C-alpha cells in the first residue's frame, strides 16, 4: 500500500482471504464490497461529487473568499483560504479542490506581482494542501475515515460524532492558525501586498443557476440529516427512524436517488447525468480499500486466525504495568511516525486492531484514543506515498523538493503540537 496503487492490493487482499481458507470468496466479497460503509461512501461520492462536477464548490469557494470584510486584512484573508478549504473538505474529498484553490491563489499572487519562488507563495501553496488534509479529518462521515470510525466502534467501542468533532474542530482551526503564525513570525513571509488586493475580484460574475441551487440545497438537507443521525440522543423518539432504520447511509442514498430522479431546465433534462457524475467522482480505489479494510480487519481480530493472540503476546511487555496515559502517548507518537512513512489508510487499519486489547486492559479512555488515532492517521503529510493529497505537493512547479518536504514537515510538527493539549483534555473530560 506504500509504494503502489491501492486498488490491486485491495482486490488481492479480498481474494487472499479465500485462498488461505479463512472464508469463501463469496463471504469475502460480501463482507467487503457488500459492507454498509462501502455503500454509504459510494452514495456520498454521488451527492458531494455532483457539487464538484457542476461547479457548486467553486462558486462557494469564490463567495467565501470575496467578502469585503477581508479587504486590507492579509492574515485574515489567508486564514480564510485555509478555513474555507477545511470547511468544504468536510463534505467532499475530491483532489480537484486542491487544484481549484491553487488556481485561485495562482491568479492572486500573479496580480500582486509576487514571484512564484517567494516564501509567501511557496508556503501558502503547501498550506492549501495541508488544509485539505486537516479538513478531511474533522468529521468521519464519508470515505475511508468513516470505515476507520466504524471499525473502531466494532472492535473497541463507540466514539460519538459529537465528541469526535469536539476535539477535531478546534484541532483543525488551531493547526492552520499555527501554520499561519509560522508563516508570519518565523518564516517572515511577506503578506503586505495582500493588504492591497481587491478581494471582490474573486467573486462570481454570474449567479447560481437552478441546477446548482437544487444541488446545493440537496446537499444541505442530506448532510443535515447525516449529522443529525449521528448526534441524535438514543432517548429521542426519532432515533429509531433516523439513526437506525434510515441512518447516514440511507440519507446519502436518498440524496443520490433524488439528484438522479429530479429534473432541471424546465423538465427537459435530469438534474445530474448520473453516469457522468459516477464516472468522474466515484473513487473505486478508495471504495476497494474501504471494503478490504473492513473484511481484513475482521479477519485480524478473529480468534481462529491467532493474529491478535500473537500481537498481545509480543507487545504485552511494552504495556505491562503501564496506564492510560502511556497508551495515549505511545499511540500519538507511533501513529504520527508510521502514517508519514506508509499509506495512512493501511496504517489506520492495522493500528486499531493492534491497540484494541491494550486499550481495554489498561483502562484507557476509549473515545479519546479513537479520536486521536483517526485524527493523526489522516495526517500523512510528508512522504508522497503517505496520502494522495500529499502526492500532489512535490508536483507543483512552484516548489522545489526541499521546500515541499520542509513545509510539510513543519505542518506535521504543528499539528502534533496542537494535538497534545487536545489529547490531554480528551483524556480528562471525555
Model-derived segments and spans:
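Hydrophobic transmembrane alpha-helices of multi-pass small-molecule transporters
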Residues: 1-40, 164-313, 410-416, 420-430
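Short helix-coil transition sites and intra-membrane helix breaks within transmembrane domains
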Residues: 2-7, 36-37, 48-58, 88-102, ...
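Transmembrane-helix boundary/entry motifs in multi-pass membrane transporters
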Residues: 33, 66-79, 118, 206-210, ...
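Select transmembrane alpha-helical segments in multipass membrane proteins
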Residues: 38-43, 76-86, 124-130, 287-293, ...
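Juxtamembrane and boundary regions of transmembrane helices in multi-pass small-molecule transporters
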Residues: 50-53, 72, 76, 115-126, ...
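Membrane interface segments of multi-pass transport proteins and intramembrane proteases
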Residues: 59-72, 311-322
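Hydrophobic transmembrane alpha-helices that form the pore/transport pathway of multi-pass ion
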Residues: 65-137, 144-156, 344-375
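C-terminal transmembrane helix pair
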Residues: 129, 133, 164-172, 288-296, ...
Amino acid at each position: 500500500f506504500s509504494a503502489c496503487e491501492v486498488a490491486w492490493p485491495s482486490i488481492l487482499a479480498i481474494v487472499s482471504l479465500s485462498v488461505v481458507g479463512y472464508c469463501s470468496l463469496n463471504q469475502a466479497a460480501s463482507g467487503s464490497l457488500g459492507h454498509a460503509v462501502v455503500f454509504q461512501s459510494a452514495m456520498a461520492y454521488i451527492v458531494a461529487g455532483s457539487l464538484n462536477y457542476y461547479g457548486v464548490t467553486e462558486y462557494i469557494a469564490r463567495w467565501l473568499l470575496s467578502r469585503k470584510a477581508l479587504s486590507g486584512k492579509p492574515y485574515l484573508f489567508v486564514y480564510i483560504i485555509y478555513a474555507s478549504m477545511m470547511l468544504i473538505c468536510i463534505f467532499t474529498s475530491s483532489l480537484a479542490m486542491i487544484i481549484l484553490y491553487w488556481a485561485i491563489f495562482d491568479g492572486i499572487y500573479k496580480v500582486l506581482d509576487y514571484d512564484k519562488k517567494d516564501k509567501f507563495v511557496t508556503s501558502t501553496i503547501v498550506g492549501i494542501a495541508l488544509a485539505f488534509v486537516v479538513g478531511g479529518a474533522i468529521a468521519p462521515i464519508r470515505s475511508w475515515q468513516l470505515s476507520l470510525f466504524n471499525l473502531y466502534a466494532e472492535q473497541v467501542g463507540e466514539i460519538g460524532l459529537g465528541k469526535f468533532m469536539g476535539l477535531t474542530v478546534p484541532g483543525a482551526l488551531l493547526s492552520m492558525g499555527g501554520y499561519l503564525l509560522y508563516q508570519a513570525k518565523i518564516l517572515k513571509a511577506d503578506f503586505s501586498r495582500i493588504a492591497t488586493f481587491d478581494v471582490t475580484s474573486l467573486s462570481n460574475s454570474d449567479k447560481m443557476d437552478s441546477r446548482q441551487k437544487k444541488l446545493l440545497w440537496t446537499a444541505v438537507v442530506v448532510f443535515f440529516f447525516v449529522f443529525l443521525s449521528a448526534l441524535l440522543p438514543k432517548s429521542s423518539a426519532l432515533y429509531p427512524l433516523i439513526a437506525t432504520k434510515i441512518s447516514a447511509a440511507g440519507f446519502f442514498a436518498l440524496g443520490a436517488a433524488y439528484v438522479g430522479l429530479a429534473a432541471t431546465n424546465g423538465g427537459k433534462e435530469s438534474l445530474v447525468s448520473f453516469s457522468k457524475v459516477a464516472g468522474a467522482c466515484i473513487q473505486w480505489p478508495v471504495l476497494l480499500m474501504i471494503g478490504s479494510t473492513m473484511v481484513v480487519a475482521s479477519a485480524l481480530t478473529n480468534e481462529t486466525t491467532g493474529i491478535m493472540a500473537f500481537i498481545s503476546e509480543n507487545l504485552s511487555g511494552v504495556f505491562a504495568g503501564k496506564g492510560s496515559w502511556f497508551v495515549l502517548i505511545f499511540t500519538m507518537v507511533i501513529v504520527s511516525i508510521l502514517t508519514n512513512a506508509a499509506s495512512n489508510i493501511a496504517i489506520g487499519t492495522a493500528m486499531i486492531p493492534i491497540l484494541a486489547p491494550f486499550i481495554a486492559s489498561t483502562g484507557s479512555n476509549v473515545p479519546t484514543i479513537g479520536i486521536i488515532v483517526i485524527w493523526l492517521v489522516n495526517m500523512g503529510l510528508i512522504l508522497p506515498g503517505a496520502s494522495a493529497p500529499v502526492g500532489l505537493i512535490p508536483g507543483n512547479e512552484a516548489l522545489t523538493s526541499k521546500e515541499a518536504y520542509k513545509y510539510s514537515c513543519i505542518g506535521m510538527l504543528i499539528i502534533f503540537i496542537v494535538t497534545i493539549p487536545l489529547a490531554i483534555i480528551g483524556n480528562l473530560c471525555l
